[in-house]
Amino acid sequence: MTLGKEGEPMRRYAVETIVDGTTKYYFIRDCETLEIVLLPSKYLKHKIKSKRSPNTVKRSAFSICYYLEYLEELSMDIPQVCGLDFEKQNEHFVDFLHWLKAGNHTQENKIRTINNGTCNAYLEDVFRFYLFAEAQDSRIGSLKVLSYSYHVAVNAVGVQKKLRYQSFKGYLKAEERDVRPAEQEEIITLLQACTNCRDQLLLLLLAETGFRIGWC
């Protein structure tokens, strides 16, 4: 294992970008071999080609990168995870959520606590990558812990489309937001801090509709 600053272990994988014209592509590099990790990078390119938003692709890139670090710690790879039985596979992904929650995905893990919703969103990105990997090569195998449901949506011209979405029983429980009604003095302080009439008007509208501290 390579040690970095103050003896901390260096991350095995890193998210990098390359710009082609006006399009930014994301890929994942193995920092030990300096090679591009092909399957995840192919998936990220697919998302760009599919016109997914840059922010969505960026988050997917980091989600997968974090997951690859998690696999590195376990000395496992994608096919091995697919080969686990239901119970072990479920445990694997629940442990990944707790690994994220503990801040192990970042070297600045003492700065702030990651919330449950963000952990769940990272895992959702990982599941989408698994579905892509399975579609690319059936020999990789498929996940046993995902259950699938279908929803029929109708577009603007009345054409029905059957949409499939996956669910996982092990997601972290949603946290209650720490909000409370804003006091009058707090609203006045915010109004006085505003530099233009537009922001003052927006604050007044929020105050009328039940402004909560913790929304901002």
Language model region names:
Residues 1-61, 65:
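Basic/aromatic DNA-contact patch characteristic of tyrosine site-specific recombinases
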Residues 24, 174-178, 189:
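A detector of helix-start/N-cap boundary segments at the beginnings of structured domains
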Residues 33, 99, 162-165:
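Short, compositionally biased low-complexity segments
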Residues 39-55, 64-157, 189:
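N-terminal core-binding DNA-recognition domain of tyrosine recombinases/integrases
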Residues 57, 61, 123, 200-207:
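Short, well-structured alpha-helical segments
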Residues 142-184:
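Flexible interdomain linker/hinge and immediately adjacent N-terminus
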Residues 180-213:
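Basic, Lys/Arg- and aromatic-enriched nucleic-acid-binding interface segment
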